[in-house]
Design a protein with these regions (language model features):
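Bulky hydrophobic/aromatic packing residues
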Residues: 2-4, 32, 38, 108-109, ...
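Hydrophobic transmembrane alpha-helix bundles
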Residues: 43-57, 137-164, 202-209
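Short secondary-structure boundary/hinge segments and terminal tails
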Residues: 37, 60, 130-132, 169-176
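Secondary-structure end/capping motifs
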Residues: 81-161
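Short, surface-exposed acidic
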Residues: 2-7, 48-54, 116-130, 159-167
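Pocket-lining segment of extracytoplasmic ligand-binding domains
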Residues: 12-117
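Conserved C-terminal helix/tail region of periplasmic/extracytoplasmic solute-binding proteins
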Residues: 151-212
Length: 212
């Protein structure tokens, strides 16, 4: 397929709406967000939820990692240099919140909805459940994932050949988990796990084998 075989349509994060309205035939989205929205829309129309399908970019590109749904905390060099303690405190706060979500997902979701009632819908509940497995326990940037995505972007011509990933784990003050010994296998197992969550609901995590 070349760029002459399709028409790109800019729709921002409104992929679900654009597909439902027929503005686009396919779009780029997240398995734990747009897929859920489309599945529930189909169910409301009396149609099977599996009428919507997703081709995972990480699987298509054989990246061996799922890194397109990462939340990044971005700061410029000047702020980092002038406020290292603030950054440390911010990361500790994020870690504390992450630990709480992983330990008490039901309570965490209830507090989330209490703070932002508009999110208290059946669809958003399912999105939260489908997002649970993706939470990073230690919040670290994984070098392998950054390198794979960077190289993939270079092959696509998005990045030039001299680009280097710009990230750091310097402001993480706790022990980091060891890297997975089978990231490609994890990718496949995560897909199967998410199918179970989609069918049965609840909060499930993937058990990952790590290097010693």
């Amino acid at each position: 397929m070349t760029a002459d075989d399709y028409t790109a349509v800019r729709c921002g994060m409104n992929v679900t709406k654009a597909i439902i309205q027929g503005d686009i035939d396919a779009g780029i989205g997240l398995e734990n967000v747009q897929m859920v929205e489309l599945e529930e829309w189909l169910a409301a129309q009396g149609r099977p939820r599996d009428d919507v399908q997703m081709l995972r970019i990480d699987q298509l590109a054989e990246l061996g990692c799922c890194c397109f749904c990462s939340i990044l905390y971005i700061a410029n060099d000047q702020f980092l240099a002038a406020n290292p303690e603030k950054v440390h405190k911010f990361m500790r706060a994020v870690k504390r919140a992450t630990d709480y979500v992983l330990a008490e997902p039901e309570k965490a979701y209830a507090e989330y909805v209490d703070f932002k009632p508009i999110m208290g819908t059946p669809v958003n509940r399912k999105i939260f459940e489908r997002s649970y497995a993706y939470f990073s326990r230690d919040l670290k940037n994984v070098r392998r994932d950054w390198e794979k995505v960077t190289n993939y972007s270079k092959r696509l011509g998005i990045l030039d050949a001299f680009f280097t990933p710009n990230y750091t784990n310097e402001y993480i003050s706790w022990a980091l988990d060891a890297d997975s010994t089978d990231p490609t296998g994890d990718q496949k197992r995560m897909a199967e796990l998410q199918k179970k969550v989609a069918a049965n609901g609840g909060f499930q995590r993937l058990e990952v084998a790590v290097s010693a």
